[in-house]
Amino acid sequence: MPSADEPSSTRTNGTSSRSDQLAYYKKQYEQLESELADFQASSRELEAELEKEIEASEKRERQLKEKVDNLRYEVEEWKSKYKQSKSEASTAQNALQKEITSLRDANLTLQLKLRDTEVANDDYERQARHTTSSLEDMESKYNQALEREVLLDMEYKQGEQERESLRIENQRLRDELNDLKIETEIVQERLRNNNRRRRPAPLGRSPSTPHTPEIFDRSPGESTVSSPLFSTPPTKLSLTLASATATPPSPPMSETSSSMRKSLTAASGFPLQKASASESFGTRSLYGNRPQRFQAHSRATSYAFSNGRSTPSATTTRPSLPKANNTTANRPSGIPKSGSLHQIRGLIGKMQKLEERVQSAKSKLPPPSETASRASSRAGSMLDASPGAATIAMRRDTRKRLSGSSFSSSVRDGDGAPSYVTSSRPSYGTRTQGDSRPSSRTSFSSSLSHSTHPSVTPSNRPESRQSRTKTPLGHYSTNPTTESRRPRSSLSNPAGQSTPINGMTYIDEDEDLAEQFNMRATISSTRPTRLPSFSNPAFSTPTGLKKRSTSGMSGIPAPRTLRRGNTMGPPKTKPKPVAGDLGETF
């Protein structure tokens, strides 16, 4: 289609003709019609295409709407799921939170309990430390108390030993007094018999009259005879009362009085008489065939139980009788010698020889197991209990070693001598070689039982220094160390074991007894001894205390056995010895 500016240009340019204008308009009109037809055809195509596009877009819109609806549904579904999960998570979180809070509370309570437990544990530990320290203090105090008990027990035992030694010394002095009384009576009897044989002498002193011995000045005041020169001898009743009532009942006589009697016998010079084992007490007299002029001294016998402890005693130095030998020398030699004197001397020699062989056989017998084991165990426990106690025991043993034990075993002494046996009181101790006192069945059986101890064997050391020697109470004998320092009395005989007295001869006897004892000694020597041998004898402990252990808790002393060594008990039933083992009965 032509634009609007063209007619103006043509008007101005071609105003010449109208035809031209018309042709022009026609041509323009045709062009416009063709353009309109083209425009309509193109618009119809465009409209069809637009409709297709609209349909496609609508279809697409419907699809998108459906998709949106689906997505909205899914969104709603996810929203519900989210809300559900959120609620579940919140509930779980709340539960967990509650559990956390409960666990925190429990943890706090446990921490508080732990703190309280630690505080209580500290208190318990403090109490345990205090208890341990107090226990240690108590253990130390207990050990000190045990040591003090050991020392006090040792002092008590020492006091008992001293008291026992004083009692033994008192008994020995009593026995010596009785022996002096008996000796006085025997000498007076001899003088009266001599005066009967001879013509009665006047009461005045003459040069031929012997001097009065000093022994009559030493006789006790109870005796009715004070001088052997009486013209009229005392009656039998007065002599019996003087010898029987002057001696009170006392513990058994110790064996140490035999040494005093030996010295008196050797110094006085009158013949010795020793009663035979087979003789009875009533048939013993100074002269064998002559009737007895006075009754024998008798008193109740009591002996103490022995528990294996040694009882040393201080030796007493009693002045001897120096004028006895002078009296013997100044006596007239006109006393006739009868056959009964020789017979008595022969019996005395026979008894001396028999006792020597019996004591030599006793020294070889085996030790008793019960006493040895008890003494050794208690002595060993005492050594381990306290070194201070052992030192004190050594110091006391050293202090009393010079005095020694004058009543220990005297088998190795060899200085026993016979004496005149007019006392019917038996001795319940170990008979020494020279002891002439009558022995009963009990005394001989007890001497056999106690002489089997290995400490009876001869030794070079004094008896008090041997730690394993336990001399029982009532078995007292002499000690060579103290016996040599003690002066002899007029009844002792230092040479009674070796040589005959006044020319008397020994009478042979049966040799079977010595053979039996030698056979028993050979058999018993093979038995092992149960006594321990301590290296240091000074550490011997006479006390029987329980050993205190090193821990301090197990050292409680056990109950001690009943000690009856210091009590005077009633005499036991006398056991009968076996006649086949001894060769003869007592």
UniProtKB/Swiss-Prot annotation:
Chief site of localization: cytoplasm
GO function terms (MF aspect): microtubule binding
GO CC field: cytoplasm; kinesin complex; kinetochore; microtubule
Region (Localization to microtubule plus ends): 215-586
Cellular localisation: Cytoplasm, Cytoskeleton
Chain residue ranges for the region called Disordered: 1-21, 191-274, 297-341, 355-504, 526-586
Bias-annotated ranges (Low complexity): 9-19, 234-259, 309-320, 436-459
Region (Interaction with nudF): 1-215
Keyword terms, alphabetized: Coiled coil, Cytoplasm, Cytoskeleton, Microtubule, Transport
UniProt biased composition (Polar residues): 221-233, 298-308, 370-379, 420-435, 489-502, 526-543
Record's keyword annotation contains Thylakoid: no
BP GO terms, sorted: centrosome localization; chromosome segregation; establishment of chromosome localization; establishment of mitotic spindle orientation; microtubule nucleation; nuclear migration; vesicle transport along microtubule
One Pfam family hit: NUDE_C
UniProt keyword Coiled coil, yes or no: yes
Source superkingdom: Eukaryota
Coiled coil (residue ranges): 17-197
Chain's role: Required for nuclear migration within hyphae during vegetative growth.
Family, as annotated: Belongs to the nudE family.
Protein name as annotated: Nuclear distribution protein nudE
The species this protein was found in: Emericella nidulans (strain FGSC A4 / ATCC 38163 / CBS 112.46 / NRRL 194 / M139) (Aspergillus nidulans)
